Amino acid sequence: MARKGKVNTLPQPQGKHQRKGKKQLENKILHSYEEESAGFDSEELEDNDEQGYSFGVNSEDDEEIDSDEAFDEEDEKRFADWSFNASKSGKSNKDHKNLNNTKEISLNEEDDSDDSVNSDKLENEGSVGSSIDENELVDLDTLLDNDQPEKNESNTASTIRPPWIGNNDHATDKENLLESDASSSNDSESELTDSADNMNESDSESEIESSDSDHDDGENSDSKLDNLRNYIVSLNQKRKKDEADAESVLSSDDNDSIEEISIKKVKYDPHETNKESEYNLIGSSEKTIDITDLLDSIPMNEQLKVSLKPLVSESSSISSKKLDAPLAKSIQDRLERQAAYEQTKNDLEKWKPIVADNRKSDQLIFPMNETARPVPSNNGLASSFEPRTESERKMHQALLDAGLENESALKKQEELALNKLSVEEVAERTRQLRFMRELMFREERKAKRVAKIKSKTYRKIRKNRKEKEMALIPKSEEDLENERIKSEEARALERMTQRHKNTSSWTRKMLERASHGEGTREAVNEQIRKGDELMQRIHGKEISEMDGEDVSEFSDSDYDTNEQVSTAFEKIRNEEEPKLKGVLGMKFMRDASNRQKALVQDEMQAFEDELAGVPNEDDTSQKGEDGVPGVLIGNNTGRRSFKPSEEAAKLSLPSRKNPFVSDSAVLKVNKPEMKEGQKKAEARKKKESPLEATEETNPWLQVPDQRTSSAKKLDKNSSKADKKNHKLKMDKVASLQELVEEPKVQPDLIFEEKAFESASEAESDVDVSVPMLKPTKGRLSIKQRELVAKAFAGDDVVAEFEKDKEDWVQEDAPKEEDHSLPGWGSWGGVGVKQRKTKPKVKKIAGLDPSKRKDSKLKHVIINEKRNKKAAKLTADSVPFPFESREQYERSLNLPMGPEWTTRASHHKAVAPRVVTKRGKVINPIKAPN
C-alpha cells in the first residue's frame, strides 16, 4: 500500500544518464516480470476457477488500515535516502516498444489495448510525480553501479515492480506465491486476489488525494483491473499448453522424454536472500526436490536414459495417485493380530511331529540323536599300526625281511609252500593243524571251567600240584640258586615278623580283626599253618600233604584243636585293658569288670581242663544246682546247658502218676516270719526236681530251674524295720540269678496215667508230651520267647485276626459319649438343694455291626470308611488302553518284579521316562527345515 499523499513512481533520471538508466531499469523490470510469469503455476489457478473459488483475502484476514500505518518506521529507515519521480509521457511509446521487444511472454498477446493502458498509467504516474523536488532524486547510474553494495541492489530490485503492481507488502506476497510450489496453489490464489484488491485501493486512494481528480482516475483503475484479468487468462492458456506438451513428452520416445527433462532448467529467482550454493538447495519447507531436478546434474547418454525410464514413469504415476485414509486403530490391531497368528501357526506346525513322537515314545534318552562314537576294531588298529618302541621296530623289520608283514603276504607264502608239497604231506599238515586247534579249544574250555570254581580247597590243592610238577622238572644251577635265595628271604622275614607266634603285634591285630573280614581270617589261618609246619619240623615230622583232603579254616587236619583253643585263650589273656572314662571308670564298675574277668578266666581254665581230660571237682561255676556239669550247645561257649545226662535222668526219674506236673524247689532267702496261712501253704508244697530226661538237648525246649521266692511282700502296713531288712536282702540277691516264678499248670490238662514199664518207655512219653514252659523274667526269658515265637510262628494267627476284626467293628459301631460335668452349671452352698442334672449324651453315628458288609464273612475285614484322598485317585472310567473293567483290574493284579516276569520285561516296566547321561550337554531340540 502507498503512503498517504504519495504515489510509488520510478526514480526520474537526469539528462542523458536519465534516458539510459531508465531504459536499463525498464528492461530489468520486464525480465523480472517474465520470470515471475513463467514461474507461476497456472494449473492450480484453473482448478480453482473451475471449482468456483474467487481470488481475494479471507474476511477474517482482511482489515482496513490507512496508508500512513502501512508505511511504518521500518520502511522509513529503508527508503530514507530514496526519491521517486514519475516518468514522462513522452517515454510511454518507448516503453511500449521495449515491452514488445521482450521475449515471447507478454501480458496479453491478443489485445493491443495494453499499450494504451500502460502509456496512460505512466502518464498519470508522471503527472503525480511532477510535484516532487528533482533535487531529491537519485541518479540510476549511481543506483545501478557495479560498485554499489549488494544490499542496495537487492533493495532496488525488490522495490521496483511492474506498472500494475503497487509497492506494498501484499505485492511481495504475490511474488513469493509465484515462486512457490503447485501444492500451495489455494493460498497463492487468495493472496493474489488480495494483492490485486489492495493495489486497486491504493491506486484509487492515490488518485483521490492527487491534485488531478478528473475522469482519467476511473479509466486508470479500470485499465488496471483489465490488465489483471488479461494476465489471469493468459496464465490459464499457458497452463493448457504446458499440459499438452507434458502429454506429448510422456507419449513420445524414451530418448526424447529424457532430453526434455534434462533441458528443463532451474530458473533464477532474483528475490533469493541466500547465496547460491550446494548447501542451500532448498530455500523453504515448501520447496521439494524432484527426480527431474536430480537428473539435470547427470550427463545423459543412451544407456542411462533407458535405465532411468521406469523411474520417470513411476514418479509420474505416484505423483498422480492420492493416498487413502488410514484405517481405524481397532481394525489395524485386528489385522496385525491375524498376521501374527498366521506366522505363529506356521512356526508351530514344524514342531508338531516332534512333539507327537516324544509323547508316544515310552522312554526319552538325552542327548537325542547322538552320533555313536566310532569303536576301533582289530582290523582298523592293525591297518593303522605303526611301530613306536625299539622292540616293535625290530619285530616289524624281522617280519619285513621274512615277507610276513601282513596277513595277505603270509597266505601267499603258505600257498607257495603248499604248491611244492605232495598230496600226502598236505593231508598230514592239515591233520596236525586240526589236532592243534582241538587241543587249543579243549584248553580254553577247561580254563573257563576252572575260572568259575570258587573253592579255596581246590585252589590250594591245585597250587600244591603245580608246585610238585615244577619240582619234578630238572632245574639248572641258576634256578636252584634262585630258589635257595627265596627260601632264605622267607626265613629272614619269618624271623623278623614272627608271624608263626601269637605274641607278635601283627598276630594280635589280626586276631582282633579276624571276625571282620575274609582276608584277615585267611591271614590268621596262614599264620597258624606256618607255625604248625615249624613245630612239625622241630619234632622231626614230615609235613602232611593236603592232596585229597578238605581244608577248612579251623579244621583238625590243619592243626591241633588244643593248640587252637590255647591260641584263642592266650589272645584273650593278652588283651590290654582299655582306659575307661566316666561312669565306667568308677570303682564299683571296675570291681564288677574284675569279677567278670575272673569268671571268664575260670571258665577258660575249666574248658582247657575238660579238653585235656582233667576233672575239676572244685569248680562249681560250670555245674548246676544238682552238681550236673554244663554242656555246650552248638559249640557255642556263650550257651551252656546245665542238664543231667541221659543216664542221670533215667536214674533220678521218680515214679509217680503224673510225671509232667512238678513243683519247683523253693529257694528261701532270709525268710521272715510268715503268717499261719502262709505256713500251711508252704507245708503243702513238695520239693522235687523239675528236670526230666530228654533224648537229646533241644535249645527250643530249655527249661531252667524254676524257683519261687516266699519272702514276705511289703505293703503299706509294713513296718520300717521290714522295709529296711527287705532292701538289704535285695541288694545281696541282686548278684544272684534272677528269680523266676513257678509256671502255672492248667487244670484242664488231663494226662493219661500210664504204667512205665521201663525207662525207655518213660523217655518216649516225655519226648512226646512235655508241655511248653516259658520263663517269665530276665534276659534269658525274653530271648527264649523270641525263639519260641519264631519257631512256632503262625499258631495263633486266627485268634489275632478275630481280635483285630472285633476291634474294627467296635470302632465303627455307633457310640454314645457323656459330656456332662458334675457340678457344672449348678448352684452351691449351704441350704441349696442339689438337682439331678440330665446327662449330656452325644450320639456319634456309626455303622451297625449287623449291617456291615463283612458281618457274615469271618475271614475278611472290610474298611467302610471313605478316604477323601483316595477318592480323588479312583478311576471313574476305564483308562484308554483297556476296553473293560476286567482287563484293567487284571493289569493291576499282575505282579511286577524279576520273580514273576522275565528280566527284559521287568527292566522295561521299571524303566524311567527320561534318561540322561552324566556329563553330557543337552542342547535344545531343533525344528526341521
Curated annotation (Swiss-Prot):
Compartments in which it is found: Nucleus, Nucleolus
UniProt keyword Ubl conjugation, yes or no: no
Region (Disordered): 1-257, 602-729, 805-843
UniProt keyword list: Nucleus, Phosphoprotein
Any one Gene Ontology cellular component term annotated for this protein: nucleolus
Biased composition (Acidic residues): 35-50, 59-75, 107-117, 133-144, 188-220, 605-619
Protein name: Uncharacterized protein C57A7.06
Lineage: Eukaryota, Fungi, Dikarya, Ascomycota, Taphrinomycotina
Pfam families in the record: Utp14 (PF04615)
GO BP annotations listed: maturation of SSU-rRNA
Chain positions found as Phosphoserine: 251, 555, 557, 758, 760, 764
Extent of Basic residues compositional bias: 833-843
InterPro entries in UniProt: SSU_processome_Utp14
Family per similarity comment: To yeast YML093w.
Compositional bias of kind Basic and acidic residues: 23-34, 670-681, 712-729, 805-820
Polar residues composition bias: residue spans: 696-711
